[in-house]
């Protein structure tokens, strides 16, 4: 009985963990989902962005005290403008989704919302991490040896 309980707890802890993508796995997933060159944003830009926003972690969150918003998921999409978490004052929800959808191992919803973000006039510049770590840099290392 004790072994069964231990096994059950182990399985529960495994299912509660985030998926952390490997760099090339993430690049290939983005390519399969039409992100290569989407609105002029290269795969290397997306991979660099996710590296610096979430370290490729699907369940990453970051609370922003200033405006009481939270950044969600592998792309750290903000609840002030893009998703609804039921907690952020004056949220816009431009992606029309619940923020919890951005924390799934299946990143389809996160990709769709990221596409919506780059269609906005700011484009990829909406992400502070992209401006700080990726803009005007050689990003070839982010997709090197990935076969994309």
Swiss-Prot record:
Catalysed conversion reaction: Hydrolysis of (1->4)-beta-linkages between N-acetylmuramic acid and N-acetyl-D-glucosamine residues in a peptidoglycan and between N-acetyl-D-glucosamine residues in chitodextrins
Catalytic residues of the enzyme: 53, 71
Tissue specificity note: Expressed weakly in myeloblasts, moderately in immature macrophages, and strongly in both mature macrophages and macrophage-rich tissues.
Gene3D superfamilies with a match to the protein in the record: 1.10.530.10
Localization per record: Secreted
pH dependence per the UniProt record: Optimum pH is 5.
UniProt cross-references to SUPFAM superfamilies, sorted A to Z: Lysozyme-like (SSF53955)
GO biological process terms, semicolon-separated: defense response to bacterium; defense response to Gram-negative bacterium; defense response to Gram-positive bacterium; killing of cells of another organism
One MF term in the entry's GO annotations: lysozyme activity
Alphabetically ordered keywords of this record: Antimicrobial, Bacteriolytic enzyme, Disulfide bond, Glycosidase, Hydrolase, Milk protein, Secreted, Signal
Keyword Hydrolase appears in the UniProt entry: yes
Complex and partners: Monomer.
Annotated protein name in UniProt: Lysozyme C-2
Species in which this protein is naturally found: Mus musculus (Mouse)
Name of the gene encoding the protein in the UniProt record: Lyz2
């Amino acid at each position: 009985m004790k072994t069964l309980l231990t096994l059950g707890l182990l399985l529960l802890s495994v299912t509660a963990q985030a998926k952390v993508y490997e760099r090339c796995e993430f690049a290939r997933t983005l390519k399969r989902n039409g992100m290569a060159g989407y609105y002029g944003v290269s795969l290397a830009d997306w991979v660099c962005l996710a590296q610096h926003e979430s370290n490729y972690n699907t369940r990453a969150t970051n609370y922003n005290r200033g405006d009481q918003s939270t950044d969600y998921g592998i792309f750290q999409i903000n609840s002030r403008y893009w998703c609804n978490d039921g907690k952020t004052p004056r949220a816009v929800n431009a992606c029309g989704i619940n923020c919890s959808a951005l924390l799934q191992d299946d990143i389809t919803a996160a990709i769709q919302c990221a596409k919506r973000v780059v269609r906005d006039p700011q484009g990829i510049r909406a992400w502070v991490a992209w401006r700080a770590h990726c803009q005007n840099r050689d990003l070839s290392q982010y997709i090197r040896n990935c076969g994309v």
